[in-house]
Regions:
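Acidic (Asp/Glu)-rich catalytic clusters
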Residues: 129-139, 160-175, 198-209, 296-303
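Beta-loop motif signature
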Residues: 33-81, 85
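Structural recognition of the beta-strand scaffold that forms the well-ordered cores
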Residues: 110-114, 141-146, 176-181, 210-218, ...
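Functionally critical loop-and-helix segments that line ligand-binding/catalytic clefts
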Residues: 105-123, 273-339
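Active-site groove signature of glycoside hydrolases
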Residues: 202-232
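N-terminal Sec-pathway targeting helices
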Residues: 2-20
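Boundary/entry segment of secreted carbohydrate-active catalytic domains
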Residues: 100-150
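Boundary regions of SH3-family modules and the immediately adjacent low-complexity/disordered segments
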Residues: 35-39, 85-105
Length: 339
């Protein structure tokens, strides 16, 4: 009969369970790491003045697509940090030094193009098919098309001669689009006239993909326009237009340059599409608020109203974009409801 040493058996069982628990913990950690990696965002940029970057002797930002991963978050001394993995290096980076830019369907920002007859007459797009190819090749998610406007010197109403070509391209590709009207009203009577023109235009151009808010385009011509001295009153004048459109169930968006928006239009109960050009031949990887040199960056009231940002008037040499045309970023969370 075999004698069993109960003491040794107990020790063996305890050791076995300790090893088992350790293996379970290790497998859990590995699983968590794998899961973290799978969920990591490759569209990450880290400022080059962080300790993590300096430790790797980097002189530039880590660019999108360089296999940068956010593993998890850590709070240290009441400050939030991201645990970042870059190749074989892992380090902590302050939350405010990490920026996300994802070009996937879950992107924080989406590309938008705006066009007019000038884009046809200048030879940028000679056919509808050429414009369709541009939209597809560059992953343009939204489009604004000029419906017409009022002349900035004589004040005559005009319509865009080529809007149908751009409209039909968006309809064919099922890309949500909207129209814009260049406002130059100098009084309430002209504002009412413009509102009536817009309503009639929309009545005659009801299409399935015309889903975006109608844009009132406030251009600044620097001393050349009949409205240049009226900027302190322009908000009041265009309110006559937007109120009439709203009463007809038309949602509106205001386009203006960032400085004029902040100086003269900030108190309007409106969302804004602002023009502020970066001067860089690339698609921005940060939102407008990160550009500290522009006037509205630190104005929380202004920034809370901006949902679209025209960052270039000459195109951006990225993503095969070689056309010299207006390009904008929009906040996806604000625009995806129009799909």
């Amino acid at each position: 009969m075999i004698k069993i040493n109960k003491k040794k058996l107990l020790v063996t069982i305890i050791i076995f369970f300790i090893i088992l628990i350790g293996l379970i913990y290790l497998l859990g950690a590995i699983s968590q790491a794998i899961t973290s990696t799978k969920k990591a965002t490759p569209g990450v940029i880290i400022e080059n003045n962080t300790e993590f970057i300096r430790s790797m002797y980097k002189t530039k930002h880590l660019q999108e697509g360089e296999n940068v991963y956010i593993l998890n978050t850590i709070t240290k001394n009441n400050k939030k940090y991201f645990k970042v993995k870059y190749k074989l290096s892992v380090g902590l980076v302050p939350e405010d030094k990490v920026y996300f830019f994802d070009r996937s369907e879950n992107a924080q920002y989406s590309l938008m193009s705006d066009v007019s007859s000038f884009d046809y007459t200048s030879g940028r797009f000679k056919t509808q098919g050429e414009y369709e190819l541009f939209l597809l090749r560059n992953n343009i998610k939204y489009v604004y098309i000029r419906a017409g406007g009022r002349g900035y010197t004589e004040g005559k109403i005009y319509y865009d001669n080529n809007f149908k070509m751009f409209r039909d391209a968006c309809e064919y590709l099922k890309i949500p689009y909207g129209f814009y009207f260049v406002d130059e009203a100098i009084n309430q009577a002209e504002a009412e006239e413009e509102a009536n023109v817009i309503l009639e235009f929309l009545k005659q151009n009801k299409t399935s993909m015309n889903k975006l808010p109608f844009v009132i385009d406030l251009e600044y011509q620097s001393g050349k326009s009949r409205t240049d001295t009226l900027w302190p009153k322009r908000g009041e004048i265009i309110t006559n237009i937007t109120n009439k459109l709203h009463s007809s169930g038309i949602e509106t968006l205001i386009y203006a340059n960032a400085k004029k928006m902040n100086t003269n239009l900030i108190n309007l109960n409106q969302k804004f599409w602002v023009a502020y050009y970066t001067g860089e031949d690339k698609i921005p990887t940060e939102w407008l608020s990160k550009y500290k040199e522009q006037e509205i960056a630190n104005n929380l009231q202004a920034m809370s109203k901006v949902i679209a940002w025209q960052f270039s008037e000459t195109g951006a040499k990225a993503n095969n974009i070689t056309k010299r045309l207006d390009l904008s970023l929009v906040l996806t969370k604000e625009f995806e409801k129009y799909k």
